[in-house]
Amino acid sequence: MAASTGYVRLWAAARCWVLRRPLLAVTGGRVPSASGSWLRRGCRACDMSAPWGGRVLPGGVQWRGLWDSGNRGGSDETSEGGAEDGATASTGEGPVVTALAPMTVPDVFPHLPLIAITRNPVFPRFIKIVEVKNKKLVELLRRKVRLAQPYVGVFLKRDDNNESDVVESLDEIYHTGTFAQIHEMQDLGDKLRMIVTGHRRIHISRQLEVEPEGLEPEAEKQKSRRKLKRGKKEVEDELGPKPQLEMVTEAATDTSKEVLMVEVENVAHEDFQVTEEVKALTAEIVKTIRDIIALNPLYRESVLQMMQAGQRVVDNPIYLSDMGAALTGAESHELQDVLEETNILKRLYKALSLLKKEFELSKLQQRLGREVEEKIKQTHRKYLLQEQLKIIKKELGLEKDDKDAIEEKFRERLRELVVPKHVMDVVDEELSKLALLDNHSSEFNVTRNYLDWLTSIPWGRQSDENLDLARAQAVLEEDHYGMEDVKKRVLEFIAVSQLRGSTQGKILCFHGPPGVGKTSIARSIARALGREYFRFSVGGMTDVAEIKGHRRTYVGAMPGKIIQCLKKTKTENPLVLIDEVDKIGRGYQGDPSSALLELLDPEQNANFLDHYLDVPVDLSKVLFICTANVIDTIPEPLRDRMEMINVSGYVAQEKLAIAERYLVPQARTLCGLDESKAQLSAAVLTLLIKQYCRESGVRNLQKQVEKVLRKAAYKIVSGEAQTVQVTPENLQDFVGKPVFTVERMYEVTPPGVVMGLAWTAMGGSTLFVETSLRRPQPSGSKEDKDGSLEVTGQLGDVMKESARIAYTYARAFLMEQDPENDFLVTSHIHLHVPEGATPKDGPSAGCTIVTALLSLALGQPVLQNLAMTGEVSLTGKVLPVGGIKEKTIAAKRAGVTCIILPAENRKDYSDLAPFITEGLEVHFVEHYRDIFPIAFPRREHREALAVER
């Protein structure tokens, strides 16, 4: 608003300048002192240079105006064309700023360029800065200024998000706007920046189309004809020069064209009388404005200048209503509503309503600011009082310094512990350093955290162990069924500790298929031994710092998992479970499996060195238990440090016992059921195991049991039944269609097909080997006598080598048994192992492949319900294989009655439980010659009969 007052002064000074311009001829071109001082005050108010000085403002902006024509002493033509001359002259670089001389605003000016603005309309007597970027509109405004027609129509757009300077249709703007005069125009090349002042309200009548610029010379000719008509009243005429109208025509019917010119008409106010109601409204508006000024200092300067500009605003209700609306931050449509209102009384009411809203908003802002300030004061006061209280207590000896309190806390932790001397030396050194550090330094926090970890380790503190064999055995039997090897090893550990009179650490590794209870048995062992339990998984771990910690200098450094374990368990002899040790990763941060070597080495972990603590820690009393699915992926040095215990899968009888003893009661408790509401018989569980859960573990069986009981709970809650009886007949209603409907692929094996036994991480399974002719056998031709063997079924390299060895031995064995049979020598044979999507590898199918090739060559099927496993050498020797328990379980599950195993696996078979080997005929062989009569008993019988004859 200060700029507004400046422009008013400048306008008055310019009028005086125009009136006294003829005196320049008398004074010799000197500016009269009165006019000069007036102009200087006006220019200073607008931050402009005096027009006669010709000075260039900072930034290369030069002010030029219509007043230059007066100094040139031109006639009427010169006066009207001065703006054009001033706009085209250039005496400096940078954007050209044209300050237009104030002139008498015409009462009627129907044809105006249209400028569309957003958010806030321009009210009469108010100034606004407008930027125009549209190329056509920029050219039009330049032309109007050159023709001494610095008038525009400013209209508000209906859409506040539309940032365009022009509109394509009159429907996009409100039709009531403001007739404005351009006071100053800064030409920036691609855009214009103007200061416009509103004068009166106007209404759009229609759209006009702008004629090309070539028609301007006609207007110039008309202007020159008026050159001789100048008389004594030339000074008065110059106060209000008659604007030169640019030729326009009515706009075409094409509505997509940009609206640049419009025809307007003035909006007249309704007649009104200054009644008591009007006086009351004006007084209330003035009072509200003053209240807003008192609350919000931002309005103070601008509003006071507007209200004290040499006139009483109260006496002008029209101006007061516009000023009240313009001061508010109301919505654009509300301000436009005030602009369009022609009834002065209603306009005053609307302006007062907007001012009241602004006043309430200002009060709310002031209240919020006061509350925030009050909170800040209270916090600051509380802080000062606390600091004073600390100083007073310290002076009276009632409270120690923060550093003294921290040191006492750390020493209190170590008072009842047996701390090694080298550790105590480090603690004393760090405490001495802590006392010299500033409380707010970063090194202070690092040292304090280090001491916190160092004093949180249970130096010399051990938990009381349970050395009662009977109690430990009862705990293990209570939690897990089977797993005799694991239980025996734990009881042996307790027995040794009892005889020694002290406990020791040990490193065990349980390996076996998923879901057999490797992780859960570790918790039971901790409970049986009376040790604290801590578990962390190393599956996918790639950072050595997870095990050995970070260096203390790093931001956010922490010790490794083992030190965290000691702090959490508060004992030196916990049971630590390192899960999924076979799935440990390796990354650019190091190899965690190598970091475990020090941790799991009984000779080294008595002085385990964590990177963060950097002092030796005794881990020799920790019982480490690792779990793995396969041991092949465990590095050999790490495997050598652990005692491997195989946790094999379960047979159907074991699964049934586990389900009845553990899984079903646990699932009933989770589902909120008891035995009377949901009953699962042994027949249902057996069918569930046989047709849905054939894997080695019981995790899937647990899921299926929970699924059955959840559906039973739903039926009871929904009111379908009071009790649910699950039977083999309705089992499919609970768990869906059976997953396994066939025990094995071939009920009767044809010639060329033999059942083998395989072992995977999921347990054992049966594996058929199929052989067939690839092309017809040649007859009579001596060419192409050498046969071939093609293998498929996604076999690994080891299994492919085993197939080639078996093929070579089968040809030799057949020529030995039947020299006249050259089937394997001349035939092209295809060998396939079904389930081709499953990768297969290993040498244990050698005997099975030899038998399948001989069966195809002899055209005789093998003994039904026969399965075999074993690696065969090139000379026919049968070598031992692994996974005997899993393979035996798989064979019994498939209904096999006769099994052929390598002789060296007799010890593994003898360790099996009687219920696994029950009903099986087992043959242990050392050479393939021992397998042939077992697999082909009929042939041996026929040969024996032939010998007898």
From Swiss-Prot:
Q: Which GO terms describe its molecular function?
A: ADP binding; ATP binding; ATP hydrolysis activity; ATP-dependent peptidase activity; DNA polymerase binding; G-quadruplex DNA binding; identical protein binding; insulin receptor substrate binding
Q: Name one GO cellular component term.
A: mitochondrion
Stretch list, region Disordered: 68-94, 213-240
Reaction(s) catalysed by this chain's protein: Hydrolysis of proteins in presence of ATP
* Transit peptide feature, positions: 1-65
Annotated active site residues, numbered on this chain, are 844, 887
Q: Where mainly found? A: mitochondrion
Q: Outline the extent of the Lon proteolytic domain.
A: 748-938
| Expressed in which tissues | Detected in liver > heart > kidney > testis.
Q: Where is the composition biased (Basic residues)?
A: 223-232
Give binding positions for ATP: 512-519
Name the Pfam families on file. AAA (PF00004), Lon_C (PF05362), Lon_lid (PF22667), LON_substr_bdg (PF02190)
Entry's EC annotation: 3.4.21.53
Keywords assigned:
ATP-binding, DNA-binding, Hydrolase, Mitochondrion, Nucleotide-binding, Protease, Serine protease, Transit peptide
Q: Domain named Lon N-terminal: which ranges?
A: 112-359
HAMAP family for the chain:
lonm_euk
For this protein, the record's PANTHER family field holds: LON PROTEASE, LON PROTEASE HOMOLOG, MITOCHONDRIAL
What is the recorded function of this protein according to its Swiss-Prot or TrEMBL entry?
Answer: ATP-dependent serine protease that mediates the selective degradation of misfolded, unassembled or oxidatively damaged polypeptides as well as certain short-lived regulatory proteins in the mitochondrial matrix. Endogenous substrates include mitochondrial steroidogenic acute regulatory (StAR) protein, DELE1, helicase Twinkle (TWNK) and the large ribosomal subunit protein MRPL32/bL32m. MRPL32/bL32m is protected from degradation by LONP1 when it is bound to a nucleic acid (RNA), but TWNK is not. May also have a chaperone function in the assembly of inner membrane protein complexes.
Fill in the subunit field for this protein: Homohexamer. Organized in a ring with a central cavity. The ATP-binding and proteolytic domains (AP-domain) form a hexameric chamber, while the N-terminal domain is arranged as a trimer of dimers. DNA and RNA binding is stimulated by substrate and inhibited by ATP binding. Interacts with TWNK and mitochondrial DNA polymerase subunit POLG.
**Protein name, UniProt field:** Lon protease homolog, mitochondrial
- Taxonomic lineage from the root: Eukaryota, Metazoa, Chordata, Craniata, Vertebrata
